[in-house]
Amino acid sequence: MKIAIAGASGRMGRMLIEAVLAAPDATLAGALDRTGSPQLGQDAGAFLGKQTGVALTDDIERVCAEADYLIDFTRPEGTLAHLDAALRHDVKLVIGTTGFSEPQKAQLRAAGGKIALVFSANMSVGVNVTMKLLEFAAKQFAQGYDIEIIEAHHRHKVDAPSGTALMMGETIAAATGRTLDDCAVYGRHGVTGERDPSTIGFSAIRGGDIVGDHTVLFAGIGERIEITHKSASRVSYAQGALRAARFLAGHQAGFFDMQDVLGLR
């Protein structure tokens, strides 16, 4: 697999490069960075003390011309620009970017009619298995239990709630026959009145170097059930992204998520 990495000088980008270099079935074909980055022109493996022969570049057209897959954990506007180039060059996409608006997500879904892509706010196998647990739990606790989602991330994360927290909320809402827009409450402040039992509450914590902690609380009378996933490093995200790329090898077009990749549907 000839794989290019977008956001190659960032925390996640470096983890992805390391994973690609370690994978026997993958070759690093490109390393894309933002225009103006001081790392442009440097070898993509310099942070590992390795020479890959692949220099960091801001030329998306060149990157897509040399790669069969592009793994993108950047920001929505950047990902959509990369999507346009991927469509022109018939490059398969693995997208782990979070913070998309609904119209932007619609653009990703539409692209699946022309190229194969996996889009997921979290590529971790553990998180996606957790989604199945939440689907089951939500059906059992649909009545008489208040649902709250608490997430914590590092101080540099720019969007809230996290994409994973929103995925959890969407999973719970769908399992109970609703949409998240109908029942989400984001943070509370001041005199809010009594809790509406039909809502799903979200709380976001930002601090330090927390990779990603997510807890869903089902609070009933006399008992509480908590389902928690904690990420100790970004390795699980990188390995999940490679697994998604391998999945795409068998598809020419289509819009998929990690539930498809893992056979959890």
From Swiss-Prot:
Binding-site residues for NADP(+), renumbered to this chain: 34
Family annotation (PROSITE patterns):
DAPB (PS01298)
Q: What EC number(s) has UniProt assigned to this enzyme?
A: 1.17.1.8
| Pathway annotation | Amino-acid biosynthesis; L-lysine biosynthesis via DAP pathway; (S)-tetrahydrodipicolinate from L-aspartate: step 4/4
What InterPro entries does the entry give? DapB_C, DapB_N, DapB_N_CS, DHDPR_bac, NAD(P)-bd_dom_sf
Task: Give the residues annotated as active site.
Answer: 153, 157
List of residues binding NAD(+): 7-12, 33, 96-98, 120-123
Q: Which GO terms describe its cellular component?
A: cytosol
UniProt keywords (A-Z) are: Amino-acid biosynthesis, Cytoplasm, Diaminopimelate biosynthesis, Lysine biosynthesis, NAD, NADP, Oxidoreductase
Which residues are recorded as binding (S)-2,3,4,5-tetrahydrodipicolinate?
154, 163-164
Q: Does the keyword DNA repair apply?
A: no
Give compartment(s). Answer: Cytoplasm
- What family does the database annotate? Belongs to the DapB family.
**Role of this protein:** Catalyzes the conversion of 4-hydroxy-tetrahydrodipicolinate (HTPA) to tetrahydrodipicolinate.
Write the protein's name. Answer: 4-hydroxy-tetrahydrodipicolinate reductase
